[in-house]
Amino acid sequence: VIVAVVLVGQRRWRAFAAQVIPYAMLGVGVLTFCTLNYTHYGVFALSDFSEGSFAAAMGAMMRVDTDSDKPYLSVPADAREKIYEAVPELKPVAYWLEEDAQMENDFRDPGLDDYRAGSFYWAIRRAAQYEGIYADAQTAANYWQTVADKINAACDAGTLPSRTGKRVATSQPITAA
C-alpha cells in the first residue's frame, strides 16, 4: 500500500500498474473459480477443504481434547470415540472409519494404528461419500456445518472436553512444546 501511494504520488503509473496487475489477476482468477463453483455446485468457495463447512467440521473435531500425545494425529481414536457419542450424525461414518478393513488399509498408518492428519481428511470424506453425503455440494455443506455446530456446542457446554477455542481449519493447532 505504501509503495502504491508513493508511485501514484510521483505519477509513476507504469510502475504502479506493474505492482497492481499481478494481484488483480490473481483476485479475478479466484473470484472466477468461486463463481464457477457456485454456478455448478451451489457453493461459493474456492475449495471445501480450505474454507466453509468441511473446514469448520475439521476444526471442531480437532478442538476436542485427547489423551493421545502422538504427533501427526489431528483427530486421534479416543477423540473420535468422544465425538461419535456426542454427534449422532457421525455414527454412520464411524463404521467406515473404525470397522471397514479396506478403509483402514487405504488410510491408516500401521505404525501409529490410527489416521495421520493428511489421510484422516480423505478417509472421512470417503466415508461420507459412501453414506451418500456427497450426493451434491449443498447436501455435503449442510451436513458438515451440522457436524461442526454440534461439536462446537458440545465443547461450549462442556459435554465434550475442549483443548482450544472454536476454529475453522484443516490444519492442526500449533502448540509450543
List each language-model region with its residue ranges.
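Transmembrane-embedded, aromatic-rich helix segments that form part
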Residues: V1-L7, D48
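Generic secretory/membrane-interface signal
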Residues: A4, P22-A24, L36
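Hydrophobic residues in alpha-helical segments
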Residues: V8-G9, T39
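Membrane-interfacial entry segments at the cytosolic side of transmembrane helices
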Residues: Q10-M25
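Juxtamembrane membrane-water interface segments immediately following transmembrane helices
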Residues: G27-A177
